Curated annotation (Swiss-Prot):
Its EC number is 6.3.2.13. HAMAP family: MurE. This is UDP-N-acetylmuramoyl-L-alanyl-D-glutamate--2,6-diaminopimelate ligase. PANTHER family: MUR LIGASE FAMILY MEMBER, UDP-N-ACETYLMURAMOYL-L-ALANYL-D-GLUTAMATE--2,6-DIAMINOPIMELATE LIGASE MURE HOMOLOG, CHLOROPLASTIC. Its main location: cytoplasm. It catalyses: UDP-N-acetyl-alpha-D-muramoyl-L-alanyl-D-glutamate + meso-2,6-diaminopimelate + ATP = UDP-N-acetyl-alpha-D-muramoyl-L-alanyl-gamma-D-glutamyl-meso-2,6-diaminopimelate + ADP + phosphate + H(+). Keywords: ATP-binding, Cell cycle, Cell division, Cell shape, Cell wall biogenesis/degradation, Cytoplasm, Ligase, Magnesium, Nucleotide-binding, Peptidoglycan synthesis. The gene is murE. InterPro entries: Mur-like_cat_sf (IPR036565), Mur_ligase_C (IPR004101), Mur_ligase_C_dom_sf (IPR036615), Mur_ligase_cen (IPR013221), Mur_ligase_N (IPR000713), MurE/MurF_N (IPR035911), UDP-N-AcMur-Glu-dNH2Pim_ligase (IPR005761). A motif (Meso-diaminopimelate recognition motif) lies at residues 414-417. GO terms for biological process: cell division; cell wall organization; peptidoglycan biosynthetic process; regulation of cell shape. The lineage of its organism: Bacteria, Pseudomonadati, Pseudomonadota, Gammaproteobacteria, Enterobacterales. It is an enzyme of class 6 (ligase). One of its GO terms (cellular component) is cytoplasm. Catalyzes the addition of meso-diaminopimelic acid to the nucleotide precursor UDP-N-acetylmuramoyl-L-alanyl-D-glutamate (UMAG) in the biosynthesis of bacterial cell-wall peptidoglycan.
Length: 495
């Protein structure tokens, strides 16, 4: 297909489609313009077929709409002179349709997909960084944003629509990308957003309770994740053997690659494997010895926490499975950077190590403090607050967690919004066994400054809650503020 012609586009499904030249393809009637192809899908929240008249009024050249059943398959109608072609199970076919429209841009780059409840963002960024250190031009697609490294733009969804995915792949191809790491969400898998893609490798991080409002139960949630490994076009399959779901999947996929931080692999494995030895944690990161089907060695990294050891070893194994050489991977590992605002490490000579993290729930704060403790050789400090006009029940819980896991606690503001900052602080303090143990410094910049100035060089300071955010909401004002920038300025380093 050398141009975007409706007849050629629909040839696999509708042999008698009219020959209209198409400019662009869209699911959103609000952005439809003259010459576009409007795709009207019956979605989970709205039925795109309701907006066909609006799209036609805006000048679209043609419409492909979801048929009510097989009887309508291939039916062609006209509305105000615009052809409307009906396809059965359109949502399932949309990935293939978009792939034909954008001329299969994936053929020009190597794509890896990462799925799981936690760790998708970090693992995709590690894959992209590492591949780039070995000479690739790398891109990421996911929660933090999409684009070539160094030029990442914010994203609305973890996995975009099939059209957005193909548009992005074409854009990355034009920018010279040779390697891309994509977060693949359970929603994206159920909604067939990536069904036409070829993944050189697929990675499973872990599975825990999440998104049950959408999937209904854990069995359906697991089934959604399984689609990437059991139904789609995948080369290498890399699976976390420390996870209960991962161990079950390894039994179903004998040639899949098993990765274990625990040091214990499932018995009688047929496929390749990688297994960590005893990890040494220190203030600047971790040293991770390992054995594998490709050889053994020690990974020296700047990442914090046991969960990041797992993410890193999954990335390492994936790149080994794709043929990247072990010596080059080990030589470059120390240059891997933590993800912006995700257990991000800041350090300077003779100053405390500082972590900036997005943890803003009780569970996330507990995990962040537990991870930080592994790397702390002095006192562990925690600077945090809770958002205003949000879940008040978590405030005392987070206070109790900070008191339990940190040696020094400073309670501060975190987007107080329309609530009085002192009321939020009082709610947090109500969870403390000894309220006198916590300092209260309402201004967030002052609180971060105080912690860093008081802490000794062997101490570690966790600044939790905002992560990559660059604002503070007070009342109705959205003020410029960044924990990362504040910490970097105090330590005299780059953010």
């Amino acid at each position: 297909m050398t141009d975007r012609n409706l007849r050629e586009l629909l040839a696999p499904w509708v042999p008698n489609a009219p020959g209209r030249v198409l400019r662009e393809m869209t699911l959103d009637s609000r952005t439809a313009a003259a010459g576009d192809l409007f795709v009207a899908v019956a979605g989970h929240q709205t039925d795109g077929r309701r907006y066909i008249p609006q799209a036609i009024a805006q000048g679209v050249a043609a419409v492909v709409a979801q048929a009510e059943g097989e009887a309508e398959e291939g039916e062609i109608r006209e509305l105000h002179g615009v052809p409307v072609i009906y396809l059965h199970r359109l949502q399932e076919r949309l990935s293939a349709l978009a792939g034909r429209f954008y001329q299969q841009p994936l053929h020009a780059l190597r794509l890896t997909g990462v799925t799981g409840t936690n760790g998708k963002t970090t693992t995709t960024h590690l894959l992209a960084q590492w591949a780039q250190l070995l000479g690739e031009t790398s891109a990421v697609m996911g929660t933090v944003g999409n684009g070539v490294l160094g030029h990442i733009h914010p994203a609305d969804n973890t996995t975009g629509s099939p059209i957005e995915v193909q548009q992005l792949l074409l854009q990355l191809q034009r920018q010279g990308a040779t390697f891309a790491a994509m977060e693949v969400s359970s929603h994206g898998l159920v909604q067939h957003r990536v069904s036409i893609l070829h993944f050189a490798a697929a990675v499973f991080t872990n599975l825990s309770r999440d998104h049950l409002d959408y999937h209904g139960d854990m069995a359906q949630y697991e089934a959604a994740k399984w689609r990437l490994f059991g139904e789609l076009d995948v080369g290498q399959r890399i699976i976390n053997a420390d996870d209960a779901t991962g161990r079950r999947w390894l039994q179903k996929l004998p040639q899949a690659i098993a990765v274990a931080v625990s040091g214990t692999l499932p018995p009688e494995r047929q496929g390749d494997w990688l297994c960590a030895g005893e990890v040494r944690y220190h203030a600047r990161g971790a040293d991770i010895p390992f054995r594998s089907s490709w050889g053994e060695g020690i990974v020296h990294c700047q990442l914090i926490g046991e969960f990041n050891v797992s993410n890193l070893l999954l990335a390492l194994t994936t790149l080994l499975a794709l043929g990247y050489p072990l010596p080059a991977l080990l030589d470059s590992a120390s240059r891997l950077q933590s993800i912006c605002g995700r257990m991000e490490v800041f350090h300077a000579e003779d100053r405390p190590t500082v972590l900036v993290d997005y943890a803003h729930t009780p569970d996330a704060l507990e995990k962040a403090l537990t991870a930080a403790r592994l790397h702390c050789h002095g006192k562990l400090w925690c600077v945090f607050g809770c958002g205003g006009d949000r879940d008040k029940g978590k405030r005392p819980l987070m206070g109790a967690i900070a008191e339990q896991y940190a040696d020094r606690v400073i309670i501060t503001d975190d987007n107080p919004r329309g609530e009085a900052a002192q009321d939020i602080i009082n709610d947090i303090k109500s969870g403390l066994l000894d309220a006198g143990r916590a300092q209260v410094i309402s201004g967030r910049a002052e609180a971060v400054t105080s912690a860093i100035m008081q802490a000794a060089p062997a101490d570690l300071v966790l600044v939790a809650g905002k992560g990559h955010e660059d604002y503070q909401i007070i009342g109705k004002q959205r003020l410029d503020y960044s924990d990362r920038t504040t910490v970097a300025r105090l330590l005299g380093v780059m953010a």
